[in-house]
Amino acid sequence: MSLVFNLVKRLQLILLSLVVGGLAVAFLSNPAAAETYIVKMGSDKAQLVYDPPSLTINQGDTVQWVNNKVYPHNVVFDKVPGGDAALAAKLSHKALLTAPKQVVESAFVDVPPGEYTYYCTPHRGAGMVGKIIVNG
């Protein structure tokens, strides 16, 4: 009887150790940290472009747009995966930035993977458009 009791106690101890070890690994492992990317609004050579014009990011990352040259600028998303107008509006910054180094940002958290295209309202006709590709 005492042999069975000792075996049960040892099995309980082993099981408890495995559970505690598994929880420690789960809580202490570092998930991939979210990144922040910078897109200049207007190139250093005063061209009406987003620099870089295309950017590939992961879900959870943030993009900051910095007013660089030849302002005013803004960021308006027109095409997003699934044609979700509410998501496009949430990511957009329609107010014009009128001073150097002003920043707006969008966090791409809980968004579907795919291509997101955007433009600058005053300079869209001049070709000031950009694209963000979100990996799944």
Swiss-Prot record:
Binding residues for Cu cation: H73, C120, H123, M128
Gene Ontology terms, MF aspect: copper ion binding; electron transfer activity
Predominant localisation class: membrane
Subcellular location: Cellular thylakoid membrane
GO CC terms, sorted: plasma membrane-derived thylakoid membrane
NCBIfam families: cyanin_plasto
Protein name per Swiss-Prot or TrEMBL: Plastocyanin
UniProt organism field: Synechococcus sp. (strain JA-2-3B'a(2-13))
